[in-house]
């Protein structure tokens, strides 16, 4: 089974919020990255 990559992009009027969630089943680890 390959890892699952979930990417959500949301744009606001005042600022842009980008949320990237990467889930690795191999290492059973969850990484959350927030960029603004």
Swiss-Prot record:
Its main location: secreted. Transmembrane segments: none annotated. It comes from the Eukaryota. Keywords: Allergen, Secreted. It is found in: Secreted. GO terms for cellular component: extracellular region. Belongs to the expansin family. Expansin B subfamily. This is Pollen allergen Dac g 2.
């Amino acid at each position: 089974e390959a890892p699952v990559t979930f990417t959500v992009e949301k744009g606001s009027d005042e600022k842009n919020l980008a949320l990237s969630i990467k889930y690795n089943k191999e290492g059973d680890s969850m990484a959350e990255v927030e960029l603004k």
